[in-house]
């Protein structure tokens, strides 16, 4: 039972492998978000492709509010670099410190030129060695491939500063029965399945994105497919993040596809 992002990666990899049989495509990043998704090996060398959902989050970094100096500090734990685009965002937020420092879990929109957000995304993925992006347009059942520098033409990008939990993990074995009993008590549970460290719950579709707070910890139900959910334990650590959300706005440009195909020779 694959998660949505993994299923999209697998579908894109299969599509590329079937359409361009003379080229070697291989899954590369897998669940490691610091690495590109697909490696392409041609007779002239290799490059990478990043897979993106047509509506998704695409990058983030932590900014820590300094109440004394009324500035935002770039966290040393960020996986991205403090580049020119990051500095522009920080400078903007510093000018409105009292407004942004109150951001909660709903977040506050960054009212800045979209080109800054798209620029951050392009520079971040260029640093990972990404040359092309691939996405799937559900509206017309079309795979779309375009070069990194065209990201802002294909996706609209919004920036937001909000507080979120720092991550999640598969729930420990000792917590599984507790979560199952809670789902049963609400009449939403049908069955469960364990695959390695992963707990899947089969139940009512209303479980999607449901969060249970049990013994001081939060457990969230991530939808895998209709009626099937992967349960994860949320971290108790909160960070305030600048987050970029993307939304597909353009169909395939044939010249961009030809550019990709030329690089496969």
Q: For each of these PLM feature ranges, what is it?
A:
Residues 2-67:
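Catalytic centers of nucleases
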Residues 51-145, 149-162, 166-221, 225-226:
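Catalytic cores of nucleic-acid endonucleases
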Residues 211-265:
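Charge-dense, extended regions
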């Amino acid at each position: 039972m694959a998660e949505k992002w993994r299923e999209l990666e697998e579908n894109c990899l299969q599509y590329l492998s079937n359409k361009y049989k003379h080229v070697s495509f291989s899954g590369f990043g897998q669940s490691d978000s610091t690495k590109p998704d697909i490696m392409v090996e041609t007779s002239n060398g290799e490059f990478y492709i990043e897979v993106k959902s047509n509506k998704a989050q695409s990058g983030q970094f932590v900014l820590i509010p300094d109440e004394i100096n009324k500035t935002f500090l770039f966290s040393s734990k960020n996986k991205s670099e403090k580049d020119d685009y990051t500095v522009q965002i920080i400078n903007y937020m510093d000018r409105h410190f009292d407004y942004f420092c109150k951001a909660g879990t709903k977040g506050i929109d960054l009212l800045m030129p979209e080109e800054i957000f798209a620029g951050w995304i392009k520079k971040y993925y260029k640093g990972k060695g990404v040359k092309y992006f691939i996405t799937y347009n559900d509206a017309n059942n079309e795979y779309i491939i375009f070069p990194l520098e065209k990201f802002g033409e294909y996706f609209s990008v919004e920036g937001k500063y909000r507080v979120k939990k720092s991550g999640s993990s598969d729930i420990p074995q000792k917590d599984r029965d507790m979560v199952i009993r809670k789902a049963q008590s609400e009449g939403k549970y049908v069955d469960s399945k364990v695959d390695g460290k992963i707990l899947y719950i089969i139940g009512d579709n209303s479980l999607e994105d449901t969060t249970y707070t049990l013994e001081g910890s939060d457990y969230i139900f991530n939808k895998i497919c209709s009626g099937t959910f992967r349960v994860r334990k949320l971290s108790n650590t909160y960070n305030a993040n600048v987050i970029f959300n993307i939304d597909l706005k353009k169909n395939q440009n044939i010249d961009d596809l030809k550019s990709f195909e030329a690089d496969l020779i």
